[in-house]
Amino acid sequence: MTKKPIVVGVTGGSGSGKTSVTKAICDHFSGHSILMIAQDVYYHDQTDISFEDRLKVNYDHPLAFDTDLLISHIAALRRYETIEKPIYDYEKYTRKQEVEIQEPREVIILEGILILEDKRLRDLMDIKVYVDTDDDIRFIRRLLRDMKERGRTMDSVIDQYLSVVKPMHNEFIEPTKKFADIIIPEGGENHVAIDLMTTKIESILQKHV
């Protein structure tokens, strides 16, 4: 390959609409080769601790992530090297033994709540996007998602949101908004902002030769 890949970081609070924005990017660049990397598959491997102890981990804290591994993988993809991406089991709160082989692509989208927290990771991104959505809407989306897709009970989701998710958002996630190049209010529903963002990505793609 002769072109340098472009890395787009998409962040925001849990339930903000990051996935919708990411899908909009993928749909727009359907003619290009695109790879989406989710930060939450880079939670630390916890096979060495009990399930009960895994439930006590604060998964909205920067230390919950194996950021060094994520950084090394994004850097490798930028060099057009293949990576072995972790596969995370959300019901067991740890990684699976299997890995997913990922080939480099022309556009790499990195999505996650804390991808702008570490400067080393920010420095690997060409465009940094923060999806800004009302707290109540984010909570409802998280509640529905965790119950449907991750086997959680309503009580456990509510308790985690009030005791961990909300305070961690205020302490760690919201402050990273200042590092964003683009702030998108209302997530995937903001078509004007998404159009502006995709235009910028196209401009960078043309220069990455």
Swiss-Prot record:
It is found in: Cytoplasm. One of its GO terms (molecular function) is uridine kinase activity. ATP binds at residues 12-19. It comes from the Bacteria. CDD domains: UMPK. Pathway: Pyrimidine metabolism; CTP biosynthesis via salvage pathway; CTP from cytidine: step 1/3; Pyrimidine metabolism; UMP biosynthesis via salvage pathway; UMP from uridine: step 1/1. Keywords: ATP-binding, Cytoplasm, Kinase, Nucleotide-binding, Transferase. GO terms for biological process: CTP salvage; UMP salvage. GO terms for cellular component: cytoplasm. Its EC number is 2.7.1.48. It catalyses: uridine + ATP = UMP + ADP + H(+); cytidine + ATP = CMP + ADP + H(+). It is an enzyme of class 2 (transferase). Belongs to the uridine kinase family. This is Uridine kinase. It comes from Listeria welshimeri serovar 6b (strain ATCC 35897 / DSM 20650 / CCUG 15529 / CIP 8149 / NCTC 11857 / SLCC 5334 / V8).
